[in-house]
Amino acid sequence: NQLKVLQKRFGTQLLHVRRGGHSIELTDAGCILYNKAKYICSVENSALKEIVNCHAGFSGTLRISLSPSMSINFIKNFLSDFYREFPHINYELYEVPIDEQTQQLLEGKTEIGIANAPLKQSKRFETLFSRKERLVALFHKDSPYLKNDKPNILLDDLEDIPLCLSRGCSELFFSVCSDSHIFPQVMSINTTKLSAIAWAEKNTGVAIVPAPAVELFPANLVRKEIKDERLFLEMTLSIVKGRELSQVAQT
């Protein structure tokens, strides 16, 4: 059968079949072959879509993995202008955690990764662009916790008030607070930045999130930069090393 042909071709066992044949699992070599096969199938599907799009008069599909809550600003600040210049390009955007982002890129499901934390297996990726985003505090204009009476705030100002963190920046924030012997009162840790901001909009806490200087927030919120040079995340745009990009991704 095909399994025996493959095992003979690669000179190794690909499956472990437990006694009785009721349980089968991949060997390490089998896992490697499985992942490579998935990538090959992904490339074939991608090529088919590009050919179909080309025949239909389109330029192709741009597939991007993004960290949670990043797509809105990415669309507003970059993709909208890109679309006006290349109106026949289609888009597939996936907002997923870093682990899944890494998997999507390596499997060829997406070609470009935009992340707010280091990708897993970082040696397999090439970073084309990076920038720093500082952590900011967002609070309601009528907040009982902070006042809009100075241009910035200090880390000390955040002690003993309910904080709402986005998960992407929580580890960094806790680390800096620990080093500074500050013990924050964290009310919630949220998967997305938008969820953290929602608490601040309802005036139930102060949101701590990463934000570029150009990002706009609801009119009822006050934005203050936290004056601490340790409180920033590095945003990166990465591709898989040594893998040729599709024509639309190269554009």
Feature-to-residue mapping (PLM):
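A short LG(V/I)-centered, amphipathic sequence patch enriched
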Residues: 7-28
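Alpha-helical linker/hinge and terminal dimerization helices associated
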Residues: 9-12, 33-55
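Short amphipathic alpha-helical coupling segments at ligand-binding clamshell hinges
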Residues: 29, 33-36, 74, 78, ...
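Flexible hinge/capping segments at coil-to-helix
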Residues: 56, 124-163
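Central regulatory/effector-binding core of bacterial HTH transcription factors
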Residues: 59-121, 190
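A late-sequence structural motif
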Residues: 74, 222-251
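Hydrophobic hinge/microswitch elements
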Residues: 97-110, 116, 168-224
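Secondary-structure junction motif
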Residues: 145-146, 152-153, 159-181, 245-250
